């Protein structure tokens, strides 16, 4: 009979209680911060539109923003990329000053007339405020990662009024093709609480309505197939434009950094260019958040070039170093692009605007599930099918690129494009591999041989960790012992987070450790003393570093190091029949 300590549901209760409390506090912080941000942006936008002469001072605003970050905020200047990098490779608590600095910088951008959004600001405020709980609660390792994800979800949900999409966004944005479910509960709680708190502060979100939604039923083959093909075509266009936005923004940023050595001068020069451009086009519809134009895209026909103009203004603003988010401009670009596509596609204007609204955002952020859920939250369930098709297609067409350079590639978007797992978007081009077609001439396609410069490497090492099935992470207090995870779950996760190339937990039928009694798995109740073997494959230096870093977690583990080499192709003697 199982003991109480072995019942999974019982073990889950302390974790649920723990993260319910932490995520609620994080949600309150995120909701309050987002309310302050939204109220500040509304004031800045109204003041700017009533005093258009302030746009002429955009270079001055850029210089001030650049000076503040250069002398006070250097450690947090990376913004969202710092958050993602800290989740993947935790080093130190996000400085508290990230929150007030990004709030001030974003308000200055909108006050003086830059084109930016608010999502990046909300994410940075939410995550940095939530991360301050790390010091109070002494959170480490995976708990701190979950806390940062919780702050991201709370910030996203509260600033856009989409709690379900916000919860999924915090899980999905970390890596392309993979979702971290370990933070699902806390992200969901923080998203719901954050949205609720923002509303309680008296903040109201924009209401988007779709005029009509046609049927995609294939029972009416001509009408249904036309709608389906239109959604696919629109999704492809949305993905390509999202790719263009991401690459243009990064390219402009690279040009400014390579040509202007003193960072504060970059937003000053960029601000001068934007101010001149606003004067040249004779309208302010392409700066700021652009909410009125987004709303118009659902109801009236707009000039077909609006999306391109907003793309250019936003890419220049963010590339020059102004602070603010990318997502609301992506909403603008997508909605106006969908509006333009209604001139050639047999779908309602409002529906295409809604599809573009979420499609361009989802593909630029590489978060298709969050964007689909957002469409359902904002536009209603009937829009889900069209949004789903366009978001998935746009995600595929945007390639391995995106607005977050620190985002990792967890799984290639295309079966015949092989990418090393864990590579960031910033380094993706140098890690792209050509697919192999001949299994017998090159078994590297199965991952058996690690290649370097076209030649097999012979320096891999196997680290075998032996422990009992019932062994758990060492805990000093009764509470720690009660909530400690089992080693057979904890150690593979540590290996994955540390970046170990390969980890395999072998299933053991029978055995014993260090002269203990012989135990066997009789498939009813697994004996606590049954041996477990976790085998890690990587370079010896990496494995030794793993043991050093996690020595406290390996107290009950017998460690065996086996030096070996990769077997090159010519030694395998494989012949095709």
How should these model regions be labeled?
Residues 1-437:
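Alpha-helical transmembrane segments and immediately membrane-proximal extracytoplasmic
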Residues 436-577:
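Positively charged, small/polar-rich N-terminal and surface patches that mediate targeting and assembly
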């Amino acid at each position: 009979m199982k003991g109480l300590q072995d019942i999974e549901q019982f073990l889950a209760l302390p974790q649920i209680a723990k993260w319910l409390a932490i995520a609620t506090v994080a949600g309150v912080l995120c909701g309050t911060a987002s309310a302050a941000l939204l109220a500040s942006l509304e004031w800045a936008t109204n003041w700017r539109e009533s005093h258009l002469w302030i746009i002429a001072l955009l270079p001055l605003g850029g210089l001030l923003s650049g000076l503040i970050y250069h002398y006070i905020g250097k450690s947090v200047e990376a913004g969202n990329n710092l958050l993602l990098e800290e989740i993947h490779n935790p080093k130190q608590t996000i400085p508290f000053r990230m929150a007030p600095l990004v709030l001030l910088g974003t308000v200055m951008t909108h006050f003086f007339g830059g084109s930016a959004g608010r999502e990046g600001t909300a994410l940075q405020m939410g995550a940095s405020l939530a991360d301050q709980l790390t010091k109070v609660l002494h959170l480490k390792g995976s708990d701190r990662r979950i806390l940062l994800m919780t702050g991201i979800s709370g910030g996203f949900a509260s600033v856009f009024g989409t709690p379900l999409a916000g919860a999924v966004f915090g899980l999905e944005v970390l890596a392309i093709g993979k979702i971290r479910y370990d933070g699902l509960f806390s992200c969901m709680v923080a998203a719901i609480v954050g949205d609720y708190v923002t509303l309680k502060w008296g903040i109201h979100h924009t209401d988007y309505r779709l005029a009509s939604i046609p049927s995609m039923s294939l029972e009416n083959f001509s009408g249904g197939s036309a709608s389906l093909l239109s959604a696919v075509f629109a999704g492809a266009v949305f993905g390509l434009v999202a790719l263009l936005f991401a690459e243009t923004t990064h390219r402009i940023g690279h040009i400014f950094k390579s040509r202007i050595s003193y960072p504060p001068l970059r937003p000053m020069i960029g601000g001068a260019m934007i101010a001149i451009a606003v004067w040249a086009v004779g309208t302010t519809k392409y700066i700021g958040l652009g909410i009125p134009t987004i709303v118009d895209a659902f109801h009236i026909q707009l000039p077909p070039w609006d999306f391109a103009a907003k793309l250019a203004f936003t890419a220049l603003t963010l590339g020059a170093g102004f602070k603010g988010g990318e997502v609301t401009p992506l909403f603008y670009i997508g909605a106006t692009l969908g509006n333009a596509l209604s001139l050639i596609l047999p779908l309602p204007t409002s529906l295409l605007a809604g599809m573009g609204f979420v499609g361009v955002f989802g593909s630029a952020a590489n978060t298709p599930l969050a964007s689909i859920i957002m469409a359902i939250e904002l536009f209603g369930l009937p829009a889900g099918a069209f949004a789903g098709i366009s978001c998935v297609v746009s995600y595929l067409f945007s390639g391995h690129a995106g607005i977050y350079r620190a985002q990792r590639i967890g799984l290639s978007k295309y079966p015949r494009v092989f990418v090393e797992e864990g590579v960031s978007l910033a380094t993706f081009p140098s890690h792209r591999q050509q697919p192999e077609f001949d299994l017998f001439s090159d078994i590297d396609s199965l991952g058996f041989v690690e290649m370097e410069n076209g030649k097999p490497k012979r320096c891999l090492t196997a680290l075998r960790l032996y422990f009992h099935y019932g062994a758990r992470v060492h805990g000093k207090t009764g509470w720690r012992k009660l909530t400690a995870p089992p080693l057979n779950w904890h150690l593979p996760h540590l290996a994955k987070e540390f970046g170990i190339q390969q980890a395999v937990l072998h299933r053991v039928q029978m055995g014993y450790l260090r002269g203990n009694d012989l135990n066997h798995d009789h498939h009813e109740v697994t004996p606590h003393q049954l041996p477990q073997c976790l085998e890690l494959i990587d370079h010896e230096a990496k494995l030794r570093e793993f043991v050093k870093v996690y020595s406290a977690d390996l107290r009950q583990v017998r460690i065996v190091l086996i030096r070996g080499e990769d077997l090159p192709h010519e030694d395998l003697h494989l012949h095709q029949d």
